[in-house]
């Protein structure tokens, strides 16, 4: 998004170390503001390693050494129809809940579009029941929920997108995108229920695939000037 000239701000944290320096430098060089990234003096920048299997899908290992005080940042200004994206374990971890809720409350108050990419890894599958109240609270805040079949299998033990939508999503948020790798995408809104095929391709790596998908959705919302109040009225003609 930054490379496409979109005004992007990243809210996160990193350590005061070489890994953190690389992360911040990369974001700045690619048009992403780091004004709201907390550089903590204690602890180390978290590192994740991706290992590709035979299908070039990634399995991850995470290394973390966080300080006691987390995400000590001032939240950015938010305006109506801005797009605020949250996701992954960062959006549900108890240590950051107060700060995440501060952001979500501000986004809701200002009338921004809240986009929630659940991205619930298998490494946290054993915490799914404990984290369920926070996950559902995020669903309630969200205007758009995006997740993969694997995410919902890890969270709910469900792999059927229709069942996920009807039993877990629709009550909280009517706008849902479920991705299933090469098997395509299912889109649900108040007026649309549709499956979109994925073009076949030779995958080199799936690292960052979900992030790129999210960026594409956000860019589409911006390009076609879709506002928060427009979401309930979207039809297939709008998506053609």
Q: Locations of the language-model features?
A:
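Conserved beta-alpha-beta core of the PfkB/ribokinase-like small-molecule kinase fold
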Residues: 92-166, 182-184
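Conserved phosphate-binding/catalytic region of the ribokinase-like
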Residues: 105, 159-240
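A short, aliphatic-rich alpha-helical micro-motif
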Residues: 77-79, 138-139, 170
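Short, conserved phosphate/pyrophosphate- and ester-handling motifs at nucleotide-, phospho-/glycolipid
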Residues: 1, 148, 210
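Alpha-helix C-terminal capping segments
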Residues: 1-7, 50-52, 220-222
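Structural motif
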Residues: 82-83, 144, 175
């Amino acid at each position: 998004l930054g490379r496409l000239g979109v005004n992007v701000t990243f809210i996160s944290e990193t350590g005061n170390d070489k890994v953190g320096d690389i992360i911040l430098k990369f974001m700045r060089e690619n048009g992403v503001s780091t004004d709201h990234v907390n550089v903590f003096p204690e602890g180390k920048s978290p590192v994740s390693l991706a290992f590709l299997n035979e299908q070039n899908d990634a399995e991850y290992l995470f290394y973390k050494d966080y300080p006691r005080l987390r995400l000590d940042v001032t939240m950015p200004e938010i305006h109506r129809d801005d797009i605020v994206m949250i996701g992954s374990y960062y959006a549900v971890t108890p240590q950051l809940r107060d700060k995440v809720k501060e952001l979500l409350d501000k986004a809701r108050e200002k009338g921004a579009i809240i986009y929630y990419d659940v991205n619930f890894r298998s490494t946290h599958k054993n915490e799914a029941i404990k984290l369920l109240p926070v996950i559902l609270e995020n669903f309630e805040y969200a205007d758009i929920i995006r997740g993969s079949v694997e995410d919902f299998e890890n969270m709910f033990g469900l792999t059927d997108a229709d069942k996920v939508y009807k039993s877990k999503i629709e009550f909280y948020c009517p706008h849902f995108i479920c991705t299933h790798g090469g098997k395509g995408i299912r889109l649900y809104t108040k007026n649309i229920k549709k499956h979109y095929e994925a073009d076949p391709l030779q995958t080199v790596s799936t690292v960052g695939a979900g992030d790129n998908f999210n960026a594409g959705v956000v860019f589409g919302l911006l390009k076609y000037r879709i506002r928060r109040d427009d979401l309930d009225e979207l039809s297939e003609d709008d998506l053609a």
